[in-house]
Amino acid sequence: MATAEKPVLTRYKDRMDKAVLSLKEDFAGLRTGRASSGLLDQIMVNAYGSMVQLNTVASISVPEPRQINVNIWDKGVVSAVEKAIRNSDLGLNPVVEGNNLRIPIPPLTEERRKDLVKIAGKYAEAQKVAVRNIRRDANDDLKKAEKASVISEDELKKMETEVQKITDGAIKQVDEALKTKEQEIMQV
């Protein structure tokens, strides 16, 4: 039975790791006082008759701490890219310079910083719920295996303890990521 328990638990650990990774991707899209190419990752552009991610029609660079440059490959989608960035809830105003957009990053107000911290907290809580749901799935599967006599009651308890350790580790990673992001947002 020892060989059968590892794949089961690693499958759930992988799912929890993906939840933590998803949180970090969500955090990359939250604006802080500094410029970051990840800030524009979630922006969708209406180009060529469909919605595509910004990075499929342009390259994004950060030449200065408070500026993002977007080099658009096709002049025909410059206005669509500008409109998508302007209409995003990031509060950015791009300046068109030929095929390039220069996006100055204004400093955040104290009120906006607090709003962003709340949003980050909501993202983190959503991922904690996802991790707990994965734990529930794992425990349900373990109980089914015990009921079907695939594992013994002792193995069930041992594996449930292991699932809880994995869950605690994932929750700790979420909390650490949130703390780091909050500090980054509140940094003036």
From Swiss-Prot:
One of its GO terms (cellular component) is cytosol. SUPFAM superfamilies: Ribosome recycling factor, RRF. One of its GO terms (molecular function) is ribosomal large subunit binding. One of its GO terms (biological process) is cytoplasmic translational termination. Gene3D superfamilies: 3.30.1360.40, Ribosome-recycling factor. It is found in: Cytoplasm. Keywords: Cytoplasm, Protein biosynthesis. Responsible for the release of ribosomes from messenger RNA at the termination of protein biosynthesis. May increase the efficiency of translation by recycling ribosomes from one round of translation to another. Belongs to the RRF family. This is Ribosome-recycling factor.
